[in-house]
Regions:
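Short, extreme N-terminal leader segments that mark the start of a protein/domain
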Residues: 1-23
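Acidic surface patches and DE-rich sequence motifs
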Residues: 6, 17, 26, 91, ...
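Charge-rich alpha-helical segments
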Residues: 7, 76-88, 131-134
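Residue-level detector of beta-strand structural context in well-folded domains
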Residues: 12, 66-68, 107, 117
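Short, exposed beta-strand/loop patches in secreted or surface proteins that constitute
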Residues: 15-16, 59-61, 86-88, 106-111
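Short, well-structured hydrophobic secondary-structure segments
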Residues: 21-25, 32-85
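Surface-exposed beta-loop interaction hotspot
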Residues: 84-107
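Glycine-rich, aromatic-bearing surface loops/beta-hairpins
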Residues: 97, 105-174
Length: 174
């Protein structure tokens, strides 16, 4: 890293959607609206290259300001989150795996006003993949997870993450 001491961080170019897919956001895409806005075309292009996705997964982490990024050599590429920093897959045995492939142990279950189910784990906070909500319901019915209700707007503050590092940067620069 000392070889490239002044490499600027990258904001607004990478997004993680609510299903655990990565998206590249070029200038044209960014001009259409924020990644999480739902505006047509604002999500950008879904990454398909498996080795690139694996590289992102291996280097995906959080800074001291609760902003998620992946370390690309000397540069941090900050991630725009559609929902949460992690997207969980739940196995039939109620095992939990992050979109990054890492196993996780649920510590808390949360349900928002829209019925979306989240887990807080030792890795961090994340949304359960929509395809796995029926399995999550079984875990709740079995008493393995006891959900608490929370409003979507309160999730980032309560669980310590920034959904849009790019927007935070713009706010700080004003």
């Amino acid at each position: 890293m000392a070889k490239w001491p002044n490499v600027p961080h990258c904001y607004g170019w990478l997004g993680l959607d609510a299903r655990g897919h990565w998206f590249m956001l070029d200038d044209r895409t960014q001009a259409l609206g924020s990644f999480a806005s739902g505006a047509a075309g604002a999500k950008g292009s879904r990454l398909q290259h498996e080795k690139l996705i694996d590289f992102i997964h291996r280097n995906y982490t959080c800074d001291d300001s609760a902003q998620w990024f992946f370390q690309n050599g000397p540069q941090r590429v900050y991630v725009e989150l559609e929902a949460t920093p992690f997207v969980w897959r739940v196995g039939a045995d109620f095992s939990v795996t992050a979109h990054t492939g890492q196993p996780a142990r649920p510590q808390r279950c949360v349900v928002d006003e829209h019925g979306r189910v989240y887990l807080d784990t030792e890795l961090g906070f994340g949304l359960i993949h929509t395809l796995d909500v029926p399995i999550a319901a079984e875990a709740v019915e079995a008493g393995l997870w006891v959900p608490e209700e929370v409003y979507t707007r309160d999730l980032p503050t309560r669980f310590g993450y920034i959904r849009s590092p790019q927007q935070m940067l713009k706010t700080l620069q004003k």
